[in-house]
Swiss-Prot record:
One BP annotation, GO: innate immune response
All residue ranges annotated as the B30.2/SPRY domain in the record: 269-452
Molecular function as annotated in GO: ubiquitin protein ligase activity; zinc ion binding
Keywords noted in UniProt: Metal-binding, Zinc, Zinc-finger
Listed PANTHER family: E3 UBIQUITIN-PROTEIN LIGASE TRIM (PTHR24103)
Zinc fingers (B box-type), renumbered ranges: 88-129
Zinc fingers (RING-type), renumbered ranges: 15-56
One Gene Ontology cellular component annotation held by this UniProt entry: cytoplasm
Name assigned to this protein: Tripartite motif-containing protein 49C
InterPro entries tied to this protein: B30.2/SPRY, B30.2/SPRY_sf, Butyrophylin_SPRY, ConA-like_dom_sf, SPRY_dom, TRIM/RBCC, Znf_B-box, Znf_RING
Residues noted as binding Zn(2+) in the record, renumbered to the chain: C93, H96, C115, H121
One Pfam short name: zf-B_box
Domain of life from the UniProt record: Eukaryota
Length: 452
């Protein structure tokens, strides 16, 4: 092949980011191709739309598939480069004046066919150089994929911890305000209990804040280690075949050790102490709720709320579900326009439920209409994925860092004060009070259970 034509051919197989032959090439929407590792490293912090460095068009960084044809062509180009290298006078076997085509995996040396059959190498494991190089490169790519998945997981966890740390003090203050407000409704002799519970809450809040900072620092440090190891593997992958084989060493073992002991996000719980006489006070407003059952599809508002929730103060701390759910609703037959009302729901050890009250027009809303979680829906919910079980309240959406109730949960509706309070009946403790509710009476009780 004419050398000029060969150069043009080889030039089409060069990644524009690393300027080496493609390694596991991916082609994005605009038609330009990059090494997958180069693409990952350059656009790691851009989760959805990325701008092509060649044409500036935007594309989605999801479901990238290897361009098999381009990968085969790049492999062929490396073989041509290897053949040119091995054909040079300097690489000829000094003893037999033959081309070195064999790689000895024991002492990592290049041999001609006669040397590989000698007494010294006869019992060693041998491979053709181009086969051995591609095999080693594939091992590196497999390890890089595992490493990158862990790096992405760590990156998500770091975002979780960063968000939690940023909003933790505000969350603690909200809990303190809610408990103070509850004690103001109790007799004066509860003053010492109130003081004790608030002090314990402050102390626990500071401890968790410190632990969040430590967890965040560990994850940031682990992120640097993972990225550094990934870059080292990527650099090794791009080496010429002979250099790759001779420099391979213990890099796979070292990369495996990096994957051990990955830091996990904290699961902070800021439990509040029991409030003496809380249930007795609320039982003065006890009502019996009669429910009307119906089944709803996955487009209903509650599922939209669960899907929209992500970790921390930015509503992003609740597990994301990809499965299609079946949602079972139970509406209260009664409606409320004024006054104070209290009722309880038995939740036991279950999860993926929510209950509360909603503005009456909610029930008549078009199911296909996009739902704003801040609009007329006042719920306590519990959802679970494989990792954690999380409590949240709505209006606005907010994660509640408290232990999950294990028996009965009470709801206290105060139409005049425009508040909805949830209590852990077993613990006689306040879960949370939703303040300044945008009530549009009549209000209707609601219970929902979602099956994934």
């Amino acid at each position: 092949m004419n050398s000029g034509i060969l150069q043009v051919f080889q030039g089409e197989l060069i990644c524009p980011l690393c300027m080496n032959y493609f390694i596991d090439p991916v082609t994005i929407d605009c038609g330009h191709s990059f090494c997958r590792p180069c693409f990952y490293l350059n656009w790691q912090d851009i989760p959805f739309l990325v701008q092509c460095s060649e044409c500036t068009k935007s594309t989605e960084q999801i479901n990238l598939k290897t361009n098999i044809h381009l990968k085969k062509m790049a492999s062929l180009a490396r073989k041509v480069s290897l053949w040119l290298f091995l054909s040079s006078e300097e690489q000829m076997c000094g003893t037999h004046r033959e081309t070195k085509k064999i790689f000895c995996e024991v002492d990592r040396s290049l041999l001609c066919l006669l040397c590989s059959s000698s007494q010294e190498h006869r019992y060693h494991r041998h491979r053709p150089i181009e086969w051995a190089a591609e095999e080693h490169r594939e091992k590196l790519l497999q390890k890089m994929q595992s490493l990158w998945e862990k790096a992405c997981e760590n990156h998500r966890n770091l975002n979780v911890e960063t968000t939690r740390t940023r909003c933790w003090k505000d969350y603690v203050n909200l809990r303190l305000e809610a408990i103070r407000a509850e004690y103001q409704k109790m007799p004066a002799f509860h003053h010492e209990e109130e003081k004790h519970n608030l002090e314990m809450l402050k102390k626990k809040g500071k401890e968790i804040f410190h632990r969040l900072h430590l967890s965040k620092a560990k994850m940031a440090h682990r992120m640097e280690i993972l990225r550094g190891m990934y870059e080292e593997l990527n650099e090794m992958c791009h080496k010429p075949d002979v250099e790759l084989l001779q420099a391979f060493g213990d890099i796979l073992h070292r990369s495996e050790s990096v994957l051990l002991h990955m830091p996990q996000p904290l699961n902070p719980e800021l439990s509040a102490g029991p409030i003496t006489g809380l249930r007795d006070r609320l039982n003065q407003f006890r009502v019996h709720i009669t429910l009307h059952h119906e089944e709803a599809n996955s487009d209903i508002f509650l599922y939209e709320i669960l899907r929209s929730m992500c970790i921390g103060c930015d509503h992003q701390d609740v597990p994301y579900f990809t499965a299609t759910p079946r949602s079972f609703l139970a509406w209260g037959v009664q409606t409320f326009t004024s006054g104070k009302y209290y009722w309880e729901v038995h939740v036991g050890d279950s999860w993926n439920w929510a209950f509360g009250v909603c503005n009456m027009y909610r029930k008549e809303k078009n199911q296909n209409e996009k739902i704003d979680g801040k609009e007329g829906l006042f719920l306590l919910g519990c959802i679970k994925n494989d990792i954690q079980c999380s409590l949240f309240t709505t209006s606005p959406l907010m994660l509640q860092y408290i232990p999950k109730p294990t028996s009965r949960v009470g709801l206290f509706l105060d139409c005049e004060a425009k508040t909805v309070s949830f209590v852990d009946v077993n613990q006689s403790s306040l879960i949370y009070t939703i303040p300044n509710c945008s009530f549009s009476p009549p209000l209707r009780p609601i219970f929902c259970c979602i099956h994934f």
